[in-house]
Amino acid sequence: MGLTTHSLLSPEHLKVPYDRERLEDVGFMTCMTLVLLGNYAQTGHFGGPLAYTPYNVAAHLVGPELGGLRYDYRRPKHPYSDKFMLAGGHNAPTSYALWMIMGQALERQYKATGDPRYFVDPKVAILPIDALGFRRGAGALKNLLQNLSLDNHPLFAQAKARGIKALAGHIESTDVTNDVNGGPSGIGIATAAGKAAFWDFMGAPSSPKVIALEGEFALAEGHAQELKTQALAMQVGKRLRILLSDNNAGIDDVLIGGVIAAKYTAYRLVDQWTSYGWNVFTLDNGNDYDQIVSTLKAMEDWDPRDRRPMIAIGKTTKGYWPRAVEGKIPGYGPQLVSYPSHPYALKMNSDYFVALARTFEEHYGVEFSGIRQGPVADPRERLIQFKTNLDVVMSLLDRNGLGDWLADRLVALGDTVKDEVPLRFDVKIDPFLDGRLRVANLPVEPQKVTVANRLSGAEKQVAITLFRKPGEMAGTRRAVSEIIKWMNYVTDNRFITLAADLSESINVEHGSLWGHYDPEANPLGTRFKAAIQEAGNVSTAIGLVSQSASVDPNQFAGVWALSGTYGAFTPLMYTPARVWSQQNQDSRFRMGVLHILAGHSGPETAADGRTHFGIFATQVWKLFPRGQTIHLNFWDYNDVAPGYFAAAEIAARDPKVGIISLEVARPDFPVADRAQFADTDLKAAAKGLYVIRDFAAGQPRHGYVLAQGSSSTVNLVKQLPRLEAAGINVKVVSAISEELFDRQPEAYRQAVLPPEARYDLMVVSTGTRRVWPIRDVGPLTDAYSLTSDWDNQWLTSGLEADVIAEAHLDPESIFAGIQRFAQDHRQRLARQRDMLAALELPIYD
């Protein structure tokens, strides 16, 4: 299909009827509720949530036939619901407020009729009582009412069902329909392309779709900018629809006329998105329901053969108020708008708040309690006034059939979500639990397997080599494509890779059994083409793994994904991954596993220059709660498969493990002869730490040497005969993964590296002295270890051998370092004993 450069701008006037008055009422209630949240909590955001409200209300209530969301408030995390992303996370009050109103409407109708269609589990819903939890922690809320003698007060009876929910200052994916942790600006929206691509990959019909809300300042952020390329590269088409709130206002400045001087008239959002190939719609007034609904309808009716992603850019007012007239609040004066309205900075029951409330009172003939008597100092009385006035807003549900309409609307929308959707994969099975992926079942010999493309009917043979013979020249990176191939062979093409234009270089290119993904021409391809966009690539990977097509929340039916680049550049991926880890920790349903490949890591990346060294950079992958990620650092080809599949075996069964990071170096080395090791197990890496050389019996012991990294370990192994000849009796332990080691039986851990060994330990590593391979090393470990930052300086660059020597990780430096460590054995232990003895001496003032 031929596509024009420019798309439809400013959709035609809506000719299809919709319940505009109902939307406006719910919208005004939402605005008033979110202002009450800020007034009584005295924190939060103000102008942005108000600006988003018409978008939010329309998307949730007009229905899928008009381009709104298909979802079930009673089952908001149903996999086949459309995905709503409040990516501008600080605008959370608009969603909290709307969900409270919806939850109240359903609870009201259920109590009135007893009809189970209206029942929503209080643990799922957000209810008016949860307003008290706005920007509060769960611990503080547990006894809040009891501490103020309000636990039996009728105003707060709703809390008896399940307490008060904590509503975070920035929205999270656990919240009702929201499917993004909208924290750092631009980070959340960047995952939208991956979420949309997931449903294309799974072969879903036009729904589920993704509707994401964001603002112009956040879309200037780097991750969000990379989304432009990501979404077009994956050809997600109308499945992705962004609603942009363009009010030219940030936190403390305007964009045009502030950050960008007004004279640069060519800086136009519409042109920016159009130039990236997107299908762009514009709204003169993004706070007008007619224009919003007409745009949603135009998006819905668009030709699905057009694979351009969609964005609607609507001019909005930050600080929008439904009853404002020409920039003024009737009876008060100038409306608080633009960036000064960003935070909720109004004093409790301030004149401006009262003016807003008055317009609501006059419009609906209601009256708020106590707001004209100034701030409420007493905490108990504040909560009473807060809940009383919230109930004033909710009382509108009892008027003019509004509550009945809203409850019926939510039930009707919910009933459009079905438990069966035709998909390309069997969603009753989690392929990552297949026994062939267990370490014990990995084939040791090279495999030649026949794979069939069930869409095209094509067949071919694929060679997979998870293990190699001793002496073969193959570095750890060479094994990466093999583990991915085995994954895709076993899981029927459910392991996706996205690399920053480095797919071949970091050895993920050939992991795809059927080549490059294309939603139409090659939907079973698992290699997603990607630009040099580390942030965007990992965000897309997160979008992919954050979805599941299983109706059973405890059963996973989705994909795993890997994003990779040079180890030195992987910190660009950290913030999205951190936010993902938080989302995964609290998810109510099983999700996939994000993989980070730190390729070309360590000082071995010498020829490219020190800008490309992954020495300090890769250590960010340890900056997660313990047990929620597994980091793997490989030195030998035959460590990769057992180490990785041990991690995969855990992650597939432990929902807390949401990230596996792999660190490999560039050079090829001879595959190690494990017959010469103390631990001859070919799959020893699965245990995290394993013994290369044990203490020689009957001789004085000189300590433990922990080895990590490629050149460091290879060069250390080369020196073992020389060390033995010199009478140096050390135990050499390979450190692949502390996280895997932590999961081994106590007896194994004691045998390999008992706790006391940490006080008699040195490290030989291509990493740094800032982050050790294991925790709790002894006080003298740093003084004797060999690391790439031994002199606290950045290394220079040059040939690989030059830089390894500069890092003091060449064979001679390693021998000398271990020799010194061994010779000082008695002295080292004596110094530590003296330190402990000093603590036992009497201390006098």
Label each residue range with its predicted role:
Residues 41-53, 84-90, 133-136, 147, ...:
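Active-site nucleophile and cofactor-binding loops and adjacent substrate-binding regions
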Residues 104-117, 131, 232-243, 275, ...:
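A glycine-rich helix N-cap at a beta->alpha junction
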Residues 133, 137-178, 187-191, 201-211, ...:
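Thiamine diphosphate
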